[in-house]
Structure formats: structure tokens, C-alpha cells
Amino acid sequence: MIKQALISVSDKTGIVDFAKALSALGVKLLSTGGTAKLLADAGLPVTEVADYTGFPEMLDGRVKTLHPKVHGGILARRDLPEHMQALEAHGIPTIDLLVVNLYPFVQTIAKDDCTLADAIENIDIGGPTMLRSAAKNHRDVTVVVDPADYAVVLDEMKANGNTLGYKTNFRLATKVFAHTAQYDGAITNYLTSLGDDLQHGSRSAYPATLNLAFDKVQDLRYGENPHQSAAFYRDVATPAGALANYRQLQGKELSYNNIADSDAAWECVKTFDAPACVIIKHANPCGVAVGADAGEAYAKAFQTDPTSAFGGIIAFNREVDEAAAQAVAKQFVEVLIAPSFSDAAKQVFAAKQNVRLLEIALGEGHNAFDLKRVGGGLLVQSLDSKNVQPRELRVVTKRHPTPKEMDDLLFAWRVAKYVKSNAIVFCGNGMTLGVGAGQMSRVDSARIASIKAQNAGLTLAGSAVASDAFFPFRDGLDVVVAAGATCVIQPGGSVRDDEVIAAADEHNIAMVVTGVRHFRH
């Protein structure tokens, strides 16, 4: 039974109401510093830990709760007579509920003007020590580190005479160990990122020791293939607008491949300002378009490759209305993603319960790093978030692109970044016309892209082409021009750039270079 609680929190969200409810249940309250003052100001009967232990806070608050009367009351096993006799001999009451959260270390180091001294002062010592003590003794002590658990704890206490069941205590304890591990990981990441000058402003983005923290969202039926097991984890610091923030409105459970393809679709569609639609198959765009609204964008995107769109993942950057929903519902779709769905659109899909509908709020955030496992190691790089602006382009041919061609080139370049290398993308009038992806030679990607357009009955006359990396020879350029392209955008940087540019002039097409490569593997 919970008779006495110790409360010491940095995040004071909801703590006064929680403490009031505990007091109403007859629980004695112990507290420290600012938390004790807050509770006392709210009219609650609270005992300062310094008065409880008979030992004052010292060293500017560095030593407050590191005392046998605190830790003895937390760590004593109630089922061991010798433990209880020791408490009685030393006049130590049990502490049955511990409510603690930690100094805001992560928030402190996120500030531009943070110093090493600031960071060090925000490394909590007493808090993690109490948390780990209580979590270790979770059989007898309830420990709460997350304000979101206050209501759960109160409800169970009220229902069971101030007592919580073992499963609840165990769950709360595992949450504590995860929290303290993440806290220590953040400290290690920061301290090992500092250079020889130990200056906050010159720290490395890649610490000497890298700790990553993810929380499991769900187990998956299987992995990329049925014989592989899998689970989906969410970054503890999930950025705004990220796929992991999805809310599923209907449909079957997401699979491993659903999630991977949905991420590719969502990241691509977010980059467009105009209403856009992206159709993904095996992590590659098979149709991308912008339009006056979601319905028009979908109709154009679907034209690119209706065959590959079968069973695809579709993402919109605008609300899906009834008209767009009716158009999409005519096809077999695995997952549909949008910032929102109108009520009428939801009714359309209610008749297709296997279609997974995901709502994700649009946001500018993205992952800080891109991670790739290799045998025995991990590759870590910054995200490829570079979007080339018109002023950064350099025309290298005698003929300059027309304004329309420039619009098509920028659209094509934006799509090419999300196509597996080697990537060749034909575009025109705000839509993809042919996509060549994942080939070992660039010329083969060019041929495949033109064949795709032919199969879809789309003309490439006057089209724009984007290549994710430079043309190593003129052969790839010759293929796209023969197919009908009149302008090309590519990074440049080949030892044969002069030969490729000369070929472009020979064909009287416009070519611009970005100086930026977009390999995607």
C-alpha cells in the first residue's frame, strides 16, 4: 500500500493536481527544492527532504536526496524481515511511491549559447539514483518518470485501496530504465562530440560514442520477406511531419514493406508546394505529379505507369476529397497517405476496408541522420535534404532553357532525388513521363525510362530529363534526346563533361548543371 511518496520533478506538468489527488488518498508527501515550494504554495501538506533526513541540502543543491533515509526507504524489500528490522532500527519509514523526472540536459545542450559548464550542471545525479533504486525495487515501490502516467497510477490506486499491481509497477520500472539509459546516452553523445577545445560551438555531429534511442511501436507480421521477423520503432525525438507520427484510420496492419514504401512516398510528396501526388512501388516513384488539386495530381501521376501503380503506395500533400478518393478507389492500393481525409472521402474508402489510410500532419522536420547497417557496423550520414534553387543552376550549353523548360527541369530534379540510382526521369507539364531506376548503367536507365513512357502511351517530345548523377559518356544523353528530350538537368563533374556538353550543343538542347549529386541506394 502506498503511504508515503517522494516527489521531485523538473517537468512540473500536472504535478500539483497529481499531488493533491495523492494527498486526498491519505498519502504523505515528501519533496525537494522548487517542487516542495510549488506544492506548499498550492496549500498541500508537504515535508522538505532536508527536514525529513535532518541533513540540509548542500553544494548548491548537488546533494539533496543522497541519504540513507531516502534510499533505505526506497530499496528495502518488504518481504525480507532483516530489511524491515534495519529500517526500524534506524527510524527509516518506507517510501512507497517515487515521482521524479530529470534535469533538462537535452534541452540545455540544444541552446546555441550552451557552454560545457552549463551542460555539466544539468547532469542530474540524485534523480537517476533514486529512479534506479525504485525501479530495482519495483516489487514494493511504484516509480513514475512520465507525467503521462499520473492518471493511470491514480486510477489504479483508487480502484485497489492505494495499491498497484505488480504488472503496473514492472511496466513503470522498465520505463524508468529506458529513460535513464536514454539520458545517459544523450550525455555520452554530447561529451564525446566535443573537440580538443571543449567548445560547444565546435562539437562534431558524429560523437566518438553514438547512442541511439528508439521506442517500439509494434511487432510486424514479418520483415521484407515472410521468413524474416521484424518490428517498427519510433525515434524518441521524432521530428514533425515524420512518417512515424502516422495515425491509421482504417485498413489492415501495416507491413514492413508498407512502412518502408510509405516513408519514400511521404518524404517525396512533402517537398512540393503545389498540390502533389506520389505513387511508390518498391521504394521507387512510378508516378509523380502536381495539379490544381489532389484529384488532378493523382490522375496525372497515375498516367505515368498504370501497370506499376497496381498495389502501390500513394501519398498526397493536400487533403483527399471525395473526387480524389473515388478516382483512387478504382485501383488496387495498399496504403494511402495524406495530411487529412474529408468525411466524404472516408465514406468512399469505408467500402474498401483493406486499404490502409494514414493521416500525417505536414511538417518541415526530418531525421537528423540517415543510418545504414553494414556487417558489424553502422554508416551514419546527414540527410540528403538539399533542394537546388534556380539561382544555383548553371547553364553549360549554347541554348538556354525556356521558362517552361526550367520549370520542368526543377520538377524532374526534385523527383530524381527519390529514385534509386542510377536514375533517369523524363518529365513535362508537372508530371513524370518515364522513370528509369536502379540500373547498373545510366544508359540502361535512360532506355528503360523511354520504354516506360512508350508503354504508357506518353509522348516524350519536348520533355525534360533529370539524371541523379553525371553522364559518364555521351551515350546516355544521346538516348534521352533520341526519345524526345529538349533539356537536361544533371550534377556535372565527369571527366568527360566537355564531351557531354558538346553532344548537347550538337543536339541543340539546353543543359543545366546543379553541382549536387543525388545518389540513392
From Swiss-Prot:
Its EC number is 2.1.2.3, 3.5.4.10. It holds the Pfam family AICARFT_IMPCHas. InterPro entries: AICAR_Tfase_dup_dom_sf, Cytidine_deaminase-like, MGS-like_dom, MGS-like_dom_sf, PurH-like. GO terms for molecular function: IMP cyclohydrolase activity; phosphoribosylaminoimidazolecarboxamide formyltransferase activity. PROSITE patterns: MGS. Keywords: Hydrolase, Multifunctional enzyme, Purine biosynthesis, Transferase. It comes from the Bacteria. It catalyses: (6R)-10-formyltetrahydrofolate + 5-amino-1-(5-phospho-beta-D-ribosyl)imidazole-4-carboxamide = 5-formamido-1-(5-phospho-D-ribosyl)imidazole-4-carboxamide + (6S)-5,6,7,8-tetrahydrofolate; IMP + H2O = 5-formamido-1-(5-phospho-D-ribosyl)imidazole-4-carboxamide. Pathway: Purine metabolism; IMP biosynthesis via de novo pathway; 5-formamido-1-(5-phospho-D-ribosyl)imidazole-4-carboxamide from 5-amino-1-(5-phospho-D-ribosyl)imidazole-4-carboxamide (10-formyl THF route): step 1/1; Purine metabolism; IMP biosynthesis via de novo pathway; IMP from 5-formamido-1-(5-phospho-D-ribosyl)imidazole-4-carboxamide: step 1/1. SMART domains: AICARFT_IMPCHas, MGS. Belongs to the PurH family. This is Bifunctional purine biosynthesis protein PurH. It comes from Burkholderia mallei (strain ATCC 23344).
